[in-house]
Design a protein with these regions (language model features):
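N-terminal amphipathic/basic leader segments beginning at the initiator methionine
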Residues: 1-23
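Mg2+-dependent prenyl diphosphate-binding active-site environment of isoprenoid biosynthetic enzymes
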Residues: 20, 24-140
Length: 140
């Protein structure tokens, strides 16, 4: 395996670990169970990996960089939940989509909850700047 491949693998593992460690409450279960379900679905994590690589190139603080990468991945999951509803998809990453496992209203609420978590992750950046939030919201 090349050094670059090893780096990508390492970053992916760190992102997956950090996603699992997000402080997502257990109650109310009807809200947080679908959120946790959506986030454990996996995927390539391409967006946060690219974000991480660019941040490393600019010597971004590692903690801030991880939070930015997590926020990007959370934003992506938010859009996937809503996209699955719009496209009537029933499977995402080899598991039932959130709206198919629960219902459309729960899926919309879970997607919105993930977006809120992404905002909280961004706000936890030590050198948080309103420009970060502005850029993030323009992407959405």
């Amino acid at each position: 395996m090349s050094q670059f491949s090893e780096l990508i693998s390492f970053i992916r593992k760190e992102i997956n670990y950090s996603l699992k460690k997000l402080p997502i409450p257990d109650t109310p279960n009807y809200l947080y169970e679908p959120i946790k379900y959506a986030l454990k679905g996996g995927g390539k994590r391409l967006r946060p990996i690219l974000t991480h690589l660019v941040g490393r190139a600019y010597n971004t603080d590692p903690n801030s960089l991880m939070n930015i990468s997590l926020a990007i991945e959370l934003l992506h999951n938010f859009t996937l939940i809503h996209d699955d509803i719009m496209d009537s998809d029933t499977i995402r990453h080899s598991q039932k989509t959130v709206h198919h496992k629960w219902d459309t209203s729960t899926a919309i609420l879970a997607g919105d909850g993930i977006y809120t978590i992404a905002q909280l992750v961004l706000n936890s950046i030590d050198r948080y700047d309103k420009e970060i939030n502005k850029c993030f919201n323009e992407v959405t």
